[in-house]
């Protein structure tokens, strides 16, 4: 496989300048520095804490610091069963996050209500409250699955046109 080096169209531009758009650079930087706020409600939160430990080392992907406040975060990870009483709080946390913001639904309870979906007080999926960007299935999903979801979100942020659905 031959590699061809493209020359700039304008001879005035030197070879060591990278031509890009500001949006592409911002999306690249955003994708490599998520600041997650966690909203752990059940056993999925334990797996989320395990993903932040030394064994899985999510710091190598740029997600090492979980933020204590939604005002400092751009990613919300909802892990566990969301009850009807907790739904307004989830919405309020989402609204307090600065734009751009993303949401990951972690676990079958957050995605669809899980085994408690028939209960009178369980929300059948967090996507009825806030828009969800990535779903991480499982009961409880392993830390590797959460890392896979974070990498999928990274791809979505770098190239937002691929994820647009009309």
Curated annotation (Swiss-Prot):
Its cofactor is [4Fe-4S] cluster. One of its GO terms (cellular component) is plasma membrane. The keyword Heme does not apply. It is a peripheral membrane protein. It catalyses: a quinone + NADH + 5 H(+)(in) = a quinol + NAD(+) + 4 H(+)(out). It is found in: Cell membrane. It comes from the Bacteria. Belongs to the complex I 20 kDa subunit family. This is NADH-quinone oxidoreductase subunit B. It comes from Moorella thermoacetica (strain ATCC 39073 / JCM 9320). The lineage of its organism: Bacteria, Bacillati, Bacillota, Clostridia, Moorellales. The gene is nuoB.
